[in-house]
From Swiss-Prot:
Record lineage: Bacteria, Pseudomonadati, Pseudomonadota, Gammaproteobacteria, Thiotrichales
Coiled-coil annotated spans: none
Gene designation per UniProt: rpsN
GO biological process, one term: translation
Organism from which the protein derives: Hydrogenovibrio crunogenus (strain DSM 25203 / XCL-2)
Name under which the protein is recorded: Small ribosomal subunit protein uS14
GO cellular component, as recorded: cytoplasm; small ribosomal subunit
Keywords attached to this entry: Ribonucleoprotein, Ribosomal protein, RNA-binding, rRNA-binding
């Protein structure tokens, strides 16, 4: 199980991304808009760079909802491979069963 502080840190990042997403999108759009002058585009890039680092969605890490494990997480289920296997073997994931061919 991951440290509780790491799980909380990811939750904090998710809130930060949601808070700044509209402003980031607006500044990114302005920074590539060729109808604006060079100075205006550079100003938009500067403002974008001054936003908090954790406001960028690329800094988010997918984590298992049950254990907080950062690697081997299936997006469809939000679970790590270990927990997905365990729950599937118990029959707790509807429609999922072990492959056999």
């Amino acid at each position: 199980m991951a440290k509780q502080s790491m799980i909380e840190r990811e939750k904090k990042r998710a809130k930060m991304v949601a808070k700044y997403s509209a402003k980031r999108a607006e500044l990114k759009k302005a920074s590539v808009d060729m109808s604006l002058s060079f100075e205006e585009r550079m100003e938009a890039m500067d403002k974008l760079a001054k936003l908090p680092r954790n406001a960028s969605p690329v800094r988010q890490q997918n984590r298992c909802r049950l254990t907080g494990r950062p690697h081997g997480v299936y997006r469809k289920f939000g679970l790590s491979r270990n927990m997905l296997r365990q729950l599937a073997m118990q029959g707790d994931v509807p429609g999922l069963r072990k492959a056999s061919w």
